[in-house]
Curated annotation (Swiss-Prot):
OBG-type G domain boundaries: 160-333
The protein's assembly and partners: Monomer.
SUPFAM superfamilies, sorted: Obg GTP-binding protein N-terminal domain, P-loop containing nucleoside triphosphate hydrolases
First-level EC class: hydrolase
Broad class of where this protein is predominantly found: cytoplasm
One GO biological process term: ribosome biogenesis
Enzyme Commission identifier(s): 3.6.5.-
Entry function: An essential GTPase which binds GTP, GDP and possibly (p)ppGpp with moderate affinity, with high nucleotide exchange rates and a fairly low GTP hydrolysis rate. Plays a role in control of the cell cycle, stress response, ribosome biogenesis and in those bacteria that undergo differentiation, in morphogenesis control.
UniProt key word Magnesium: yes
Name assigned to this protein: GTPase Obg
Biased composition (Polar residues): 129-143
Lineage summary: Bacteria, Pseudomonadati, Pseudomonadota, Gammaproteobacteria, Enterobacterales
MF term (GO), any: GTP binding
Organism the protein comes from: Enterobacter sp. (strain 638)
Cellular component terms per the entry's GO annotation: cytoplasm
Amino acid sequence: MKFVDEATILVVAGDGGNGCVSFRREKYIPRGGPDGGDGGDGGDVWLEADENLNTLIDYRFEKSFRAERGQNGQSRDCTGKRGKDVTVKVPVGTRVIDQGTGETLGDMTKHGQRLMVGKGGWHGLGNSRFKSSVNRSPRQKTMGTPGDKRDLQLELMLLADVGMLGMPNAGKSTFIRSVSAAKPKVADYPFTTLVPSLGVVRMDNEKSFVVADIPGLIEGAAEGAGLGIRFLKHLERCRVLLHLIDIDPIDGSDPVENARIIVGELEKYSDKLAAKPRWLVFNKIDLMDKAEAEAKAKAIAEAMGWEDKYYLISAASQMGVKDLCWDVMAFIIENPITQAEEAKQPEKVEFMWDDYHRQQLEEQEVEVEDDEEWDEDWDEDDEEGVEFIYKR
């Protein structure tokens, strides 16, 4: 299946149903009074995280999701039916952005997590709500309010503990193949990896971590060279980055300059990502003897101004790989994920009169005589009825 990590969708919540203007009509009851019911609330639009999904490709074809409108109120104080909600399932790790405002509405990081992205409109009120001692035959009603309408940008960001960085052909895919059951394509040409991939590294029965492999970066990636830097977003949730350096590039390039290019592209993309813990890992040490590899790695680290620990490995022959993985596991255990504050579910808001509507009702006080005749031929199309509009 094609990997798609960005999509745009339109969500439209249901409008609220209108209130009804109606009067009780029954034999031997000449003055039945108002019995117009309220409308129903409009349906909401929800997003739900599903761990069984791993791409947004479905939303390249289906881009519009609309909740059901609330039904209008009816006579005999019958309330309109509430509109049905719509639930849109997205992969775990999806970030939701409102295109109109640029606001991040939420991150779907847990299976089953739900996020309301479109609130249905409020119901309108029927004329029975307006009856009073001075207005026994009200012809007022309120219309339902429109539901929310939004254009949403969905961005899938992989959930991994460890992210891998490096130039093309640095050995990232070979490394993930050697430590996990993932089988990304490996070949002797640049940009063999075209889409991100995940691998689970199991250290024992209880300890494991997830590593993410993304396509390689080259100089000018921030300006669109190569595959660009858009895949770097998949590393934003990683706790540590492994910067793989080919200790002896086959193309004769300078390893120090290659490392600086990666750091520069990271800084151009995001200061936050550039500030993440980053470990230096020299790969392909099996191509030279141990002493030469150690001397070369030391020279490269000094030229970079690197003062922290670095690792020498061979992903192909798994030299030094196990020790590196155990150190990564220890780091992950010592630095657990900080639990983000769970999004609070919006509370159900009951309709409340505001000052404007109270004032309007007070101004509508009309004296009604006991012998006043009821309008027996009235129906909902009567143009003399008054409609009240309210806002949330």
